[in-house]
Amino acid sequence: DDWGIVDGHHLERDWSFPDFASALEFTNAAGVICEAENHHADFELGWGRVKAIIWTHKIDGLTESDFVLAAKLDRI
């Protein structure tokens, strides 16, 4: 999957994993990146899947920082 822009408001991407532990490991790694960037995505975690949702809360929309964070999450 790739990132999608939803309603011109936020970025979304889904990842698939072989099990819950792998999905959790990815989410934890993503959280470390979010903390380092001081820009925090919303995550939905389930068995073998993770969804990330990114937008800038201050403007209730997208900024360059959202795309930078998305690119960094792609490198995990």
Regions found by a protein language model. Give the residues of each.
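Long, contiguous binding/interaction regions
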Residues: 1-14, 18-24, 28-76
